[in-house]
A protein has these predicted regions:
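Preference for the N-terminal adenyl/adenosyl cofactor-binding alpha/beta module
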Residues: 114, 118-364, 393-402, 440-448, ...
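Signature of N6-adenine DNA methyltransferases within the class I
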Residues: 87, 98-141, 190-198, 202-210, ...
Length: 919
């Protein structure tokens, strides 16, 4: 179930007569509990409640209370030992009249009438594996409205298949935007009479729905016709009550899709919702997926929370406006100057979606302007901040439509909030006729033509707002000469997930600038164009982006050329989790990076709730000089060579579980000579066991004598022949071997390719000469043990985390980026002896806790004291080699490592990642 299906199920449950015995199970069913789970809870097999309730382990403890005893029941649930033992996330008590619940992790409490509990369904979304931000959890209206509109959209498509074609898709999307406006307008007195639109459709159309589209067409036509022209236009008398809207929202075709009885019912139900509660930023981001067949199942996936949007907007320009407001105090002249400045500010989102960033920027600026007007004694003054100064580019037409509509709604709501409903209504209609959101490809549109510093070369004013061609990219500004701030959350899309078209777009942009782009994220194009915009103007830009653009190889590939445009990073937000409404969404690790033309101004680094002024910010988001770490083919410190492990690409046919190995040896004992222990990241960290078939070229025929081995070789062959990669197909005949073999037959230090960021150290291991390392490990063969101490140090972890990048938040290791670039002072024999002893102590401490695995031993909350002491001693010895003492913190560690890296590579030619090399 997704959030919208859950909301419908919960609403249905609340409308049914209350059944005390069945409620707990119906509640869990609404959140997606399976029949087998419910059956076992009903029978008592898994229900471990100790107070006569229903307890679902790790989820919720529910108690149906006697009438009037809900508060006491909630207390009993909270103090219940079973609640604690089962690690329940929630407790819930109800008597069918009152409803109380508590989130045991946050302490957040719900108290309401039973019939109103569906309004808080977002509170319980974690029960369905949906983790999301507070704003969405509390926005039950937006979820409900989007879910209902989605059902209507699907039903209309079913009855009007021609409206789903590319030829008419835009008309369908435009129709949905018109409906949303009508629902909002009838509940906010814009239509002067509550439920005017819904009531008119219900009263004037037949219950069999045969003429529903005709009635709606007449209403739309009325709203596109001035009062004096309505008689000649043949507007029905009953439609004359609708105002003239203008703005192009109802211009052009007034065709309406045919409604079935089901679609008509959906429409009337949607009209019955309270549209005054709409949040244009939340609703817009949810509704934009309705018109996308591929995304309809993940409504809400585009939402960026207000706190995360403000991580961009506040340091970009809003903080400065608030500081100037504070400085102005009650000085009328200073307040007037600030208001004048704000009226000329342009906010430009070149990947605006449904307008989240633009809407929040507008609302925040209106809040500041309202305070200015209040201090000047002009609280009801009309806003001087025009919507036309909020610009956007959006690839798809429906989100572009919704972005325009969201801004209109935000303007009206702001007028009501700061000036009163009377003034807001007096000036709302007819809508302004200017266009401010362009539908098109941001990588193909000239941003300066859309949002130039002093207007545009081609000044085109449209006849109306929504009738303007969505591809129009040259629109003049109402206020010229102001500041421009670019912002947004452009598409990330890693290099391996880009389409051919997206690759071509990057090629068109970067080839002419000499930037090797094949391993760059898609969002790098937005940073490039923003930097060019800043270079040519006095603009500034800030984008939310995955942290990968400030880590690993992308720093070396992108940032040197980008910073040569005479721009600088002037603020950055340290990595944080960005989550949306998608089910089982763990979130993406993001950063915010702010760019401007070099000007010597202040720079800031934000992390958690702290703000730190720094002297510089490099592309790794560190207070250090601009250093770019490329791939190195060998260790700059002269350490022994580290290779990637051996890659099977075998369809799983050369790898055996312990049980498969036992079965094979039971039937073919002679096959034991062809089996070896196999180690990847999971085997090293979690202590798992696997084996592989390892056959030399001169042993193939002998191995094939074992039937199961021969069968497995044939499966490997078929798997490789079916591959899309020619290099893999060529190796189909070598089906007895791993496809890439680096080295084997020697003892090795191994380092996992990916490991948890929660551990204080990268969990290195050792394998024996008869054991095989997979490509999920990096290996140093026949090593000296002091290298184990270096790789197991805090210093090495901090370096790798910074220059190699991350997979989500996990540490992603690289030999060519992390190990080979790690700088070391010259080690004396005594240094090596001391480090060898440290490595031995770490290994002995691990051995003392056998059979505990690495994952358990290196859990930061459970790490044994002797193992921690061994690592502390290792860090002490290694760090003393650098500076004669322990480093005070990770910042000091990185500063020293970057300084030493710069010295060790100064004047040396770099074998970068642009040169093919053996890993």
């Amino acid at each position: 179930l997704n959030a919208f299906e859950i909301e419908e199920a919960i609403s249905s449950l609340a409308e049914q007569p209350f059944d005390a015995s069945d409620f707990p199970f119906l509640f869990l069913q609404a959140f997606g509990a399976k029949e087998t789970t419910l059956r076992r809870l009903r029978s008592g097999d898994t229900n471990k409640s100790d107070i006569g309730g229903v307890l679902q382990t790790t989820n919720i403890h529910i108690k149906v209370a006697a009438t009037g005893a809900v508060t006491d029941a909630l207390k009993d649930l909270k103090s219940s030992p079973a609640t604690s033992r089962a690690k329940a996330k929630f407790i819930l008590a109800t008597d069918g009249l009152d409803f109380q619940a508590e989130d045991l992790n946050t302490g957040e409490v719900i108290v309401c009438e039973y019939r109103k509990f569906p309004e808080f369904f977002g509170f319980f979304l974690p029960l369905a594996g949906i983790s999301t931000v507070k704003q969405i959890r509390e926005s039950s209206f937006d979820i409900k409205a989007t879910g209902r509109l989605n059902r209507l959209y699907v039903e209309l498509q079913k009855d009007n298949p021609e409206w789903s074609t590319s030829a008419r898709r835009h008309e369908m999307n435009h129709f949905m935007a018109r409906l949303i406006f009508c629902f909002f307008a009838e509940d906010t007195d814009i239509f002067m009479k509550e439920t005017l639109f819904t009531a008119t459709v219900e009263q004037m159309s037949s219950k069999d729905s045969s003429d529903t589209h005709v009635v709606i067409e007449a209403i739309f036509k009325a709203m596109n016709t001035r009062s004096e022209d309505r008689a000649s236009a043949g507007i029905p008398r009953w439609a004359n009550v609708f105002p003239y809207v203008n703005g192009g929202l109802f211009s052009g075709s007034t065709d309406v899709p045919v409604f079935s009885k089901i679609a008509r019912t959906y429409l009337l139900h949607i009209g019955g919702l309270d549209w005054k509660k709409i949040n244009p930023d939340i609703f817009g981001s949810m509704i934009q997926a309705v018109a996308d067949d591929d995304e309809r199942g993940s409504l809400g996936m585009h939402y960026t929370s207000v706190p995360n949007i403000l991580k961009v907007l506040n340091p970009l320009f809003l903080d400065d406006l608030r500081e100037k407001l504070e400085e102005a105090g009650d000085n009328p002249r200073k307040l007037l100057n600030l208001r004048s400045r704000m009226s000329k500010i342009r906010v430009f989102d070149p990947a605006c979606g449904s307008g989240n960033f633009l809407v929040i920027a507008y609302k925040q600026m209106r809040e500041i302007e309202a305070e200015i007007n209040k201090r000047r004694g002009e609280p009801e003054r009309r806003s001087e901040i025009p919507l036309t100064n909020f610009r956007g580019i959006e690839l798809r037409d429906f989100p572009a439509e919704i972005a325009r509509l969201a801004l209109i709604i935000a303007e009206y709501q702001s007028d009501v909030l700061y000036r009163g409903q009377k003034e807001a209504l007096a000036e709302f209609l007819p809508l302004d006729s200017k266009n401010w959101v362009t539908c098109g490809n941001a990588l193909e549109i000239d941003w300066l033509s859309l949002c130039g510093p002093t207007g545009t070369g081609v000044k085109i004013r449209s006849k109306d707002l929504f009738g303007t061609p969505l591809h129009q990219a040259e629109i003049d500004f109402e206020n010229e000469g102001g500041e421009t701030y670019m912002c947004g959350n452009p598409p990330y899309i890693g290099s391996s997930k880009q389409t051919k078209e997206q690759k071509n777009e990057l090629a068109n942009l970067f080839n002419r600038n000499g930037v090797k782009f094949k391993n760059l994220d898609y969002i790098s194009a937005w940073f490039w164009l923003a930097a060019e915009f800043c270079r040519l103007t006095q603009a500034a830009a800030a984008f939310v982006t995955t942290n990968s653009i400030c880590q690993g190889e992308q720093v070396f590939l992108l940032w040197p050329a980008l910073l040569r445009k005479d721009v600088e990073i002037f603020f950055a937000q340290a990595p944080f989790k960005w989550a949306n409404l998608a089910q089982n969404n763990a979130g993406v690790t993001c950063v915010v990076v702010g760019l401007r033309r070099k000007n010597g101004g202040k720079k800031y680094l934000f992390f958690e709730d702290q703000k730190k002024e720094v002297t510089r910010l490099n592309p790794y988001l560190l207070d250090f000089d601009d250093v770019f770490i490329p791939r190195h083919s060998e260790s700059i410190a002269g350490l022994p060579r580290m290779l990637k492990g051996n890659q099977p690409t075998d369809g799983g046919n050369l790898i055996l579980s312990p049980e498969e190995r036992r079965n094979l040896l039971a039937s073919s004992p002679d096959a034991s000579r062809f089996l070896r222990p196999l180690y990847g990241s999971k085997e090293i960290i979690d202590g798992l066991q696997r084996y592989c078939i390892w056959v030399e070229d001169d042993e193939v025929e002998e191995a094939k004598a074992t039937t199961e081995l021969a069968v497995r070789f044939e499966k490997v062959k078929q798997s490789r022949l079916e591959s899309g990669a020619e290099s893999t197909r060529k190796r189909a005949l070598d089906s007895h071997r791993f496809i890439q073999i680096q080295e084997y037959g020697k003892a090795a230090i191994v380092v996992p390719e990916v490991s948890s960021e929660k551990r204080g150290y990268i969990p290195c291991g050792l394998i024996k000469s008869n054991e095989i390392a997979t490509n999920k490990l990096f290996a140093i063969y026949e090593p000296k043990l002091f290298v184990f101490a270096i790789c197991s140090s805090r210093l090495h972890r901090v370096w790798v985390e910074t220059v190699c990048g991350k997979l989500e938040e996990r540490i992603s290791y690289s030999n060519v980026l992390g190990y080979n670039t790690f700088s070391l002072p010259n080690l004396t024999e005594k240094n090596k002896t001391d480090l060898t002893r440290c490595a031995e102590d770490i290994l002995l401490a691990r051995e003392a806790h056998f059979p505990a695995n690495i994952a358990h031993l290196y859990d930061p909350e459970k790490m044994p004291a002797d193992l921690k002491a061994a690592h502390d001693r290792n860090d002490e010895v290694l760090e003393a080699i650098y500076i004669g003492r322990r480093f005070r913190n990770d910042t000091e560690r990185l500063e020293k490592l970057f300084e030493l890296y710069t010295k060790m590579t100064s004047g040396k030619p770099t074998k970068s990642g642009n040169i093919k090399m053996k890993a």
